[in-house]
Amino acid sequence: MSILKKPDLADPKLRAKLAKGMGHNYYGEPAWPNDLLYIFPVCILGTIACCIGLGVLEPTPLGEKADPFATPLEILPEWYFFPTFNLLRVIPNKLLGVLSMAAVPIGLITVPFIENVNKFQNPFRRPVASLVFLFGTFTAFWLGIGATMPITQALTLGFF
């Protein structure tokens, strides 16, 4: 028994739909009007309803009030800046830190050119892009966790 539904290309109705351009190069239903008119608004309204519902049912506390006369012991950036903060903190030379952050978008720009070597490759399977994504995600989490630790444990996370 197969999990995938294979199209019956001998079916004249399916051939007529594919000849009209319905679907893509693979078997499927058209985006217009099925997705754009029916599924997208349901997803958007569902997301908005979830956000409003969570905001009403579980409001986030603001925390303690700011005191302009007391400096906190450790000043940390927002959570989404943790990886870059840790990278700048760990690399001793500031120029190397900035260049290492500039290397990230440059490396991401080169990925499509590396992937495009095999023209007959299935566009849904991108091994290089998948590996770059997994490595980047793992590195970002690792550096983000390390940003909350002392600088002696920033890269090893206390494991080594």
Curated annotation (Swiss-Prot):
Name used for this protein in its record:
Cytochrome b6-f complex subunit 4
Pfam families reported for this sequence: Cytochrom_B_C
Q: Which family does it belong to?
A: Belongs to the cytochrome b family. PetD subfamily.
Give the CC-aspect GO terms.
chloroplast thylakoid membrane
Please give the subunit comment from the record. The 4 large subunits of the cytochrome b6-f complex are cytochrome b6, subunit IV (17 kDa polypeptide, petD), cytochrome f and the Rieske protein, while the 4 small subunits are petG, petL, petM and petN. The complex functions as a dimer.
Report a single Gene Ontology molecular function: electron transporter, transferring electrons within cytochrome b6/f complex of photosystem II activity
Which HAMAP family does this UniProt record tie to the protein? Answer: Cytb6_f_subIV
- Coiled-coil parts of chain: none
PROSITE patterns on file? CYTB_CTER (PS51003)
Give the transmembrane region(s).
Answer: 36-56, 95-115, 131-151
**Where, subcellularly, is it found?**
Plastid, Chloroplast thylakoid membrane
Supply the CDD domains for this chain.
cytochrome_b_C (cd00290)
Domain of life from the UniProt record: Eukaryota
What is the phylogenetic placement of the source species in the record? Eukaryota, Haptista, Haptophyta, Prymnesiophyceae, Isochrysidales
Please name the GO terms of the biological process aspect recorded for this protein, alphabetically. Answer: photosynthetic electron transport chain
The protein's UniProt keywords, in alphabetical order, are: Chloroplast, Electron transport, Membrane, Photosynthesis, Plastid, Thylakoid, Transmembrane, Transmembrane helix, Transport
Q: What is this protein for, i.e. what is its function? A: Component of the cytochrome b6-f complex, which mediates electron transfer between photosystem II (PSII) and photosystem I (PSI), cyclic electron flow around PSI, and state transitions.
Q: Which PANTHER family match?
A: CYTOCHROME B
Membrane disposition: Multi-pass membrane protein
